[in-house]
A protein has these predicted regions:
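Conserved beta-strand hairpin/beta-sheet module of binuclear metal-dependent hydrolase folds
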Residues: 1-42, 111-129, 143-144
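Active-site environment of divalent metal-dependent phosphoester hydrolases
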Residues: 11, 55-60, 80-81, 108-110, ...
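Active-site metal-binding motif and surrounding structural segment of the metallo-beta-lactamase
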Residues: 23, 32-76, 143
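Active-site flanking residues adjacent to catalytic metal/cofactor-binding acidic residues
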Residues: 27, 53, 128, 147-149, ...
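Catalytic phosphate/metal-binding cores of nucleic-acid and nucleotide-processing enzymes, i.e., regions
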Residues: 49, 231-237
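Glycine/small-residue-rich loop that forms an oxyanion/phosphate-binding "nest" at active or ligand-binding sites
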Residues: 53-111
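Catalytic core of the metallo-beta-lactamase
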Residues: 92-146
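Cap/insert and terminal regions of metallo-dependent hydrolase folds
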Residues: 138-226
Length: 238
């Protein structure tokens, strides 16, 4: 399986997850549709579907365009609003060879979902734009994490106009570390850190601190154009 970052950060977020069979699932679509098509090497036929965490444009910008192309888009926050669900309701969706469990995480009053994705015998946890995660997936034995680390507490300026939104709607380093620790196991192979604030993160420090939590895993930072081959621990690398 291959994970590719097309965009990450406050200007837009979009990733692709491609299975061994060649099916691609788009994770958030917060960039112009032409950028998504380019990131797919213009091969739209390979796209099984798209999942969107929440309504903010840096995550959802192109979802109408994707729907107009006949591609299935899973927007659980809309479905949950439609049924007036409380914060404990989860939804499950099957898209091609991907099974996606959506669960709710707090984002400063905006309905927002994290995803646990099952594909190729692996479990991938995707969390972004959250204050904290109210769930543990320890028993699931997650293989891969794509998780936000938006700021470090001692690097943030409390006079920022969006300070309250940042602390109530985004993940601080200690919170990210706590989520990794809670869900860590010998099965965890990669922790990819995303949606990192330019002025509020020290990448080297964050990688080093998360590595202490999961020494067996590869810890890396998401950047546009970067990709990772995701394998289970017992999978042959050749």
């Amino acid at each position: 399986m291959k994970l590719t970052c097309l965009a990450t950060g406050s200007s837009g977020n979009c990733y692709t997850l491609t299975s061994a069979a060649g099916e691609t699932l788009i994770l958030d679509c917060g960039v112009p549709i032409k950028d998504i098509k380019k990131g797919l090497d213009w091969n739209i036929k390979c796209v099984a579907g798209c999942i969107v965490t929440h309504e903010h444009k840096d995550h959802s910008l192109s979802f109408y365009s994707i729907r107009r192309m006949g591609i299935k888009v899973f927007t659980p926050y809309e479905d949950l609003d439609r049924i007036e669900a409380d914060e404990n309701v989860m939804l499950t969706e099957k898209i091609g060879g991907f099974t996606i469990k959506a669960f709710q995480v707090p984002h400063n009053g905006t309905r927002n979902c994290g995803f646990l994705i099952y594909a190729d015998g692996q479990k991938i946890l995707y969390l972004t734009d959250l204050e904290y995660c109210p769930y543990s997936f320890k028993n699931t034995k997650v293989n891969q994490m794509l998780i936000e680390c938006n700021y470090i507490k001692d690097m943030i300026n409390t006079d920022l106009p969006n300070y309250i939104h940042k602390v109530r709607g985004h993940c601080e380093l200690e919170t990210t570390k706590g989520i990794v620790a809670t869900n860590n196991s010998e099965s965890l192979q990669n922790v990819i850190l995303c949606h990192m604030g330019v002025e509020t993160c020290d990448n080297d420090r964050i990688i080093a601190e998360v590595q202490k939590i999961a020494p067996q895993a590869n810890i890396d930072v998401a950047e546009a154009g970067k990709s990772w081959i995701l394998r289970k621990g017992d999978e042959c690398p050749f």
